[in-house]
């Protein structure tokens, strides 16, 4: 990986094992301690729910933002570092029935569980991308494989020049945000699964569709 145009690398969950060139590891509350790095150099940082929940809450919380670490890491990076570009790699959330899905073997990750916040990964991806663009930040996908992320795909060699910000339908975004505020589906602790009975699946589908309507290919 070329480091010239990359200021900060955030590894998600087990991804710290891929390379030693990471600055920060972000992981969920239920991540086994045995899977954390055995030794963490003073130049590296571990980030848990104690830090990232407040960050994602700043963008509407986990019910609207999506309860999976790929999106949580994105909102955290936006809040904490306010970068011009966030480049994702290895976060495509594709899980074929056969074959290797992760560098460590077969994965059964967050997007496969029955989660009311993850009915449309594409919608949640688009929502994150638009919130980033409003901060002047471009989201891109460095993976060249099929992806559930809706971010533009680019080569890592092009990161030295900040990618162009996306265009989106402002009216559709306004409608999505208005519906989010009206429903007020928010759990400050981030533990939305403890109150999932309070949230309507169909209403969340409506919000997802509005975010998808923001960008028409």
Enumerate the language-model features and the residues they cover:
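Metal-ion/cofactor- or nucleotide/acyl-coenzyme-handling active-site neighborhoods
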Residues: 1-217
